[in-house]
Amino acid sequence: MESSFTQKDMLAQVNQLWSMLDDMAENSPESYQKFIQRHMKEGKEFMTPPEPNLCIHTKILEPDEKILFINICQWNRVPAPMSEAHPVPISAGQLENLSDGTVVAIAYNPEVLKRAHQDHVELDQLIRLAMKYIEEQYQITLCHSYHVAPFQLKGNAKMMKESLERIQKQPATNKGNSSCATDNSLLEELKSIALIREKQETSPSICITREDAPKSTKTKLIEEISSTDLQNRDLLPSPWHELSVTKDNAGHPQSLILKVKLRGVHSVAECDLSVSKDDLLLVVPGRYRLLLNLPQAVNEETVAAKFNKANYILLVTMPTL
């Protein structure tokens, strides 16, 4: 299906982008410099190709027994975990058949591998995480024993890079829509900066609504998704957050207060928040996913949330039952 994003639309977006950049350069030179420098740095890091780190030698047991080489590499496109308590993001390439076995590329953030090489236990955990991910991704069974190959890379760097990038491009909608989304993202960021410059104030409350359903039914917490969507959601990092309990004079829980730092988010429209009596789910598509079991039952009908664009803080207030 061809994209409806035409050349005329793209030209209009570009003109709007330049207009807003000119306005920022004139009215807020410091913000303009920071904006340009950050995007140049991010662009440079994003374009850095994956670098081989070590190669693991093991075996595929099922469906067919064969040698497997796992090229573990470092790549800036893979984010670092938000904290030590958060899951480690991972990216995998495609299984490629060679004359003497099969090879697959696994990418971690450079800082993750740097720390792992200082601790043999942590490095072993990363290797086993990679093996488990490969088993689940490709529905195969691996031998749980392995050894580190005497070389860093099986195959060549070009094949490894292409394999990882093919996976990153899936699931693709179409190039036109992707370009449109990128342009809109930049425009939204510029609009947000301009808005913050004009007024440092909190945005209106997020409206949390529920469809007519029995009260025991959780809203939006169960959703049928494809296997690809499931993989993508599991890989999304959890944002920094802080959950506190306010109590009345008698010491009884009165409400739960959740603070969430959503860097890179500029509008409440990007957030999908669902709260039930005993848990909370926050999703920012393509950026963050946070699922919390609440320590106290809350009144889901009176939950309120506000997003402060100036500091990227989402504040959720949940009165207890």
Swiss-Prot record:
The record's section on InterPro entries has:
PIH1/Kintoun_subfamily (IPR050734), PIH1_N (IPR012981), PIH1D1/2/3_CS-like (IPR041442)
Record's PANTHER family? PIH1 DOMAIN-CONTAINING PROTEIN 1, PIH1 DOMAIN-CONTAINING PROTEIN 2
Q: What is this protein called?
A: PIH1 domain-containing protein 2
Question: To which protein family does this belong?
Answer: Belongs to the PIH1 family.
State the disulfide connectivity: none
Q: Which gene is transcribed and translated to give this protein?
A: pih1d2
Superkingdom to which the source organism belongs:
Eukaryota
